């Protein structure tokens, strides 16, 4: 029953939708509301969220605003990039990887404040409802979960606006606010809705909020060097920064050179296809560099095994299973593969392209020019290849002698 909830922690952005949810929770559940706003690098001022919550009757001690940027990159983005994770061949999982941290922190605040429920603003059609709720239940299976979009009858924009006006919630539009449904963090920004709901319709150029069009990017390329330790980025052009600082710097470089735009139709976990556009400038650079480093530091079979496991790992993140035992098992294997992923990668950035022009690892490179040179060598006997080929062809030879045709 609705009156059984005493206190609820709401994932709160300060925007119209979550402000309506806040008021709806107060009215429908007659409960105390705690707001939680996460700073994961979305690029918006968060103090307005505090003021908005106060204006809606939330006590100061029940307003939580947390800077999670470094934790987000260090404990979520970097581990994911050790795996080179991509969903359905293209999507760098920018929204998916942010939800577990938000859910975990929200559940922790519920414990801290004695709340018996949590609430989110994800719709009943999308993946985020699954990601949030799997996260909540992983940390506290006794929490009641309130998903307003699955309960209320405010099922149109007109009804939402009417509810806001009735309850004195400010509905003034922010200057420069995009008409698209957007989600942003340090790894990416996404766009959905409006003309994008027709997959045949190209997005307008003014939709893209972060990056230059590759056509308008500088005519001069830029060379950068990225340093890695155990698979994680530690420095850009020799400058060591915090995890959040490193990704911020990569984003600046990628946006400048028109890198990281993506327009895809993806298969949602709930069963439908969805068209989305994404900008992941820093992540696109990071993925290219990390794979280049692995090309000289990973054993062949280890690298191939990682590539076989990656789609499963990516699907676990996309579908909301970050805290699952199977994801943690895969992570342990992936992290073991990164012990020798130390070195430097040199890249050229130019009009939407990330071009690898050098890679080196002073202590961990498995590239040995003495073995692969096209010049005369003394370490590799080419005659050995004949026996290698014959043994590997043995099954073909036996089948052929048995009359089988291929």
UniProtKB/Swiss-Prot annotation:
Pathway note: Amino-acid biosynthesis; L-arginine biosynthesis; L-arginine from L-ornithine and carbamoyl phosphate: step 2/3
Q: Which GO terms describe its biological process?
A: argininosuccinate metabolic process; L-arginine biosynthetic process; urea cycle
Its keywords, alphabetically, are: Amino-acid biosynthesis, Arginine biosynthesis, ATP-binding, Cytoplasm, Ligase, Nucleotide-binding
Q: Which residues of this UniProt protein bind ATP?
A: 11-19, 38, 121
Q: Say if the entry is tagged with keyword ATP-binding.
A: yes
Enzyme class of the recorded protein, top EC level: ligase
Classify the main location. Answer: cytoplasm
**Do you know which CDD domains this protein is assigned to?**
ASS
User: Which Gene Ontology molecular-function terms are recorded?
Assistant: argininosuccinate synthase activity; ATP binding
* Locations listed in the record: Cytoplasm
Q: Can you state which reaction this protein catalyses?
A: L-citrulline + L-aspartate + ATP = 2-(N(omega)-L-arginino)succinate + AMP + diphosphate + H(+)
Q: What top-level branch of life does the organism fall under? A: Bacteria
Residues annotated for L-aspartate binding in this entry: 123, 127-128
Amino acids binding L-citrulline: 91, 96, 127, 131, 181, 190, 266, 278
- Please describe the quaternary structure of this protein: Homotetramer.
The family assignment reads: Belongs to the argininosuccinate synthase family. Type 1 subfamily.
Mind telling me what this protein is named?
Argininosuccinate synthase
Which gene name does the record give?
argG
